[in-house]
Regions:
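Helix-start (N-cap) detector for alpha-helical repeat units in TPR-like alpha-solenoids
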Residues: 48-50, 83-84, 120-121, 154-155, ...
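Canonical tetratricopeptide repeat
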Residues: 88-91, 125, 159, 200, ...
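Residues within mature, well-folded domains
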Residues: 134, 166-167, 206-211, 222-459, ...
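N-terminal leader/linker segments that initiate helical-solenoid repeat arrays
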Residues: 40-91, 95, 99, 103
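Structural signature of tandem alpha-helical TPR/SEL1-like repeats
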Residues: 62-70, 95-111, 133-145, 168-186, ...
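Intrinsically disordered, low-complexity terminal regions enriched in Ser/Thr/Pro/Gly
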Residues: 399-700
Length: 700
């Protein structure tokens, strides 16, 4: 029989405890060794993994980002906190430009920052990733942290400036604009080769309305990059802001000599400034006709047509340039002139007021980023709205209805808006013209009236006077550079003093444009006139009558003189008469037929009819024709000794009501029975009342 122990076990209790103790110690030692080896490896990769890192770095430089990630994957698993390997992996993942890649990069960079909070390169990478993902608040915090550690970090200054620029465009805070200037200025101080920073700093000074500072920055930059297109363009804009148009024009010439044909086409495109009807017509023209169309278009808008410089086209180039600088969308590459705000700027210039709204809070109504620009002109106020539909920073027109908005009406009926800064007090000259038949052809006389209150009394021979005649296509035909020497003065208590200067040109029948300029160098005032003139054909073979010349003064007695000589008439270029002064006029009759008695006879009939006002009704106009105080009709017969006659006429217009009228002359040859007519508009006003009421007189 076998003996059994009491415990029922083959091993003693002491030996069992000893085995368990040794097993526990072995496990602890093994874990410690593994942790030690793992820790050393995560800090210092071995030769095998370093070779893998070198291969990955080469692939990254070759822009093979997916292969780079595959090569780095084992390193990321075995050495998760090794900075260089993880940083390269994050950069490669980000470079794939996928959502998953950016997510992985963000996760790795945040982990690295927790282990290496003082590594500026890691923080830079994280900040730029936040900026790329449009997490601007996070990016701003990272760049501000970098600048606290290193004030000369030019990259952080520049990126922070970009964030502030975005905020300025959205919210219009002057504080953001000032700080944006500070950040870009700090960038160019530490990095003189950052072309984008120079360009953005100059643009910021432009928005700050500091062209002097803008030029200082650009001149410094152009010393290093004399052919930089944006810098040359901004220089032209800066000179324009200072009112130095000639210098601005030189810079624009330099700009166009450097840029390509496509850029020149963008800056010279007039499609935004003409109506859709004219745009369709323009597209059907050939190349030569298009060039003529554009030249005529710009010349017609020239605020100073007597000079070689066309400030209106300079303003157009300025607006296109500003739209490029301020509204180009960096993310999509959309040029500024193709955005809503850019187009509005090119059409109308800068608005008087700007509004911005943007709400994404749960407690408020959803609102996409919206810009509203408020304008006001002679037609009244109007506004243009833009919306950032994709939250991309690209604003486009807000089209909420198919009904014509104020913007649509402005586009179709008044597509251009510009008010030139002449750098002087500007007044408009009074102007009239009349054509007379002479031996050499039609002689067109021009009568210019300068209000004496606008020029300094003194030697009129020292006041420059410029007159230029253009044909209908704005080709210069004649130019006279003279003074006001020889001008005559007319003054009455109710009219005020007017200085009258006469010029004459020999012109063929047709349509012309007359440009006149008077510059008082003492007071600095500038008198301008741009008027369309039609020269009538006056026949030498049959009865004809000259244009009607309105006059302030004429000789009381009729003097028989040769046609057009020593008329003794003081022209009235204003076309306005103040009762009780009569309407005075001068005209000439040509080619009368001789009667059997050797004399020449003709009948003159004149009619004065009211001109229908723009705001009047048709039936009101018809009723005025039957009002005894609204029209005058009379006739008389004249007998003269020659086939041509110089006629002077005074008409009492005291019975007429105040308003605008048309004088119609009808001359009938009593022998040949031929008839001819001539017309002239004038305005009749009343004498101011004794109580001091203002006169209603004006100049049509």
């Amino acid at each position: 029989m076998r003996n059994e122990s009491p415990s029922g076990s083959d091993l003693s209790p002491g030996r069992d405890l000893c085995l368990n103790f040794y097993l526990l110690v072995s496990i602890c030692l093994l874990v410690s060794v593994c942790l030690l080896v793992s820790g050393c490896a995560s800090t210092v990769p071995g030769r095998k993994y370093m070779a893998r890192y070198e291969r990955a770095l080469g692939l990254y430089q070759e822009k093979k980002y997916e292969e780079t990630l595959k090569e780095l994957k084992p390193l990321l698993i075995h050495f998760p906190v090794w900075a260089e390997g993880s940083l390269l992996y994050a950069r490669a993942a980000r470079a794939t430009e996928t959502i998953e890649g950016r997510r992985q990069a963000s996760k790795i960079l945040v982990r690295l920052m927790s282990n290496y909070p003082d590594r500026a390169d890691i923080r830079h990478e994280l900040a730029s990733l936040y900026f790329e993902q449009r997490f601007f608040t996070y990016a701003r915090n990272q760049y501000e942290t970098l600048l606290r550690a290193n004030e000369k970090d030019s990259e952080s200054h520049y990126m922070l400036g970009l964030i502030l620029q975005r905020d300025w465009k959205r919210y219009g805070s002057k504080k953001d604009l000032s700080r944006m200037i500070t950040e870009f200025a700090s960038t160019v101080e530490t990095d003189t080769l950052n072309r984008e920073a120079f360009s953005r700093l100059a643009a910021a000074y432009l928005e700050k309305e500091r062209p002097d500072s803008m030029l200082l920055v650009l001149n410094r930059f152009l010393r290093s990059y004399p052919s930089d297109l944006d810098a040359v363009m901004l220089g032209a804009i800066a000179y324009h802001e200072q009112g130095k148009y000639e210098q601005s024009s030189k810079e624009w010439d330099r700009f166009f000599s450097l840029c390509d044909a496509a850029t020149q086409g963008v800056f010279n495109d007039i499609s935004l400034l003409i109506t859709p009807q004219r745009r369709k017509k323009f597209k059907r023209l050939d190349k030569a006709a298009k060039e003529q169309f554009v030249r005529t278009f710009w010349k017609g808008l020239d605020p100073t047509p007597t000079t070689e410089l066309n400030e209106r086209i300079l303003e157009h180039w300025r607006r296109v340039g500003i739209s490029k600088v301020l509204f180009t969308v960096d993310a999509s590459g959309t040029p500024g002139w193709r955005t809503g705000p850019g187009e509005a700027l090119i059409r109308y210039g800068f608005p008087k007021n700007r509004e911005f709204s943007f709400t994404l809070e749960e407690t408020a109504a959803l609102s996409l980023p919206t810009l509203i620009w408020h304008y006001s002109d002679e037609e009244g106020p109007f506004e243009v709205a833009f919306v950032d539909y994709a939250l991309s920073g690209e604003f486009q027109y807000f089209e909420f209805t198919r009904l014509p908005t104020a913007f649509d009406r402005k586009t179709y009926y008044s597509p251009t808006s510009y008010e030139h800064n002449y750098g002087a007090q500007v007044f408009h000259n009074l102007f009239a013209n009349a054509g007379f038949l002479r031996d050499s052809g039609v002689r067109e006389e021009l009568y210019v009236g300068i209000p004496l209150e606008n020029v300094t009394k003194g030697d009129w021979g020292k006041v420059p006077f410029e007159a230029v005649i253009f044909d209908s296509l704005w080709n210069e035909l004649s130019r006279v550079s003279t003074t006001l020497d020889g001008a005559r003065t007319y003054a009455e208590p109710d009219v005020g003093g007017i200085l009258i200067r006469e010029l004459s040109f020999g012109l063929a029948p047709g349509r012309y444009v007359v440009a006149l300029a008077v510059k008082d160098t003492v007071s600095g005032t500038l008198g301008l006139t741009k008027a369309n003139v039609t020269v009538r054909a006056l026949s030498r073979d049959r009865l004809s009558v000259s244009d009607i010349e309105l006059a302030y003064l004429m000789p009381e007695k009729r003097v028989e003189t040769k046609i057009g000589k020593d008329k003794g008439i003081l022209p009235n270029p204003s076309g306005t008469y103040v009762v009780p002064k009569p309407l005075r006029l001068y005209y000439e009759v040509y080619n009368l037929a001789r009667g059997r008695d050797g004399r020449y006879r003709f009948v003159t009939k004149y009619s004065i009819l009211p001109i229908k006002s723009a705001g009047g009704t048709f039936w009101g106009f018809v009723a005025s024709l039957f009002s005894g105080q609204h029209y005058i009709v009379n006739s008389f017969e004249r007998q003269v000794e020659s086939p041509s006659s110089a006629e002077r006429l005074s008409i009492d217009i005291s019975a007429l009501r105040d308003g605008s009228y048309n004088l119609i002359l009808e001359v009938e040859d009593s022998v040949s029975k031929q008839r001819v007519t001539a017309e002239r508009a004038f305005e009749k006003v009343s004498v101011p009342s004794a109580s001091g009421g203002a006169s209603t007189r004006g100049h049509p």
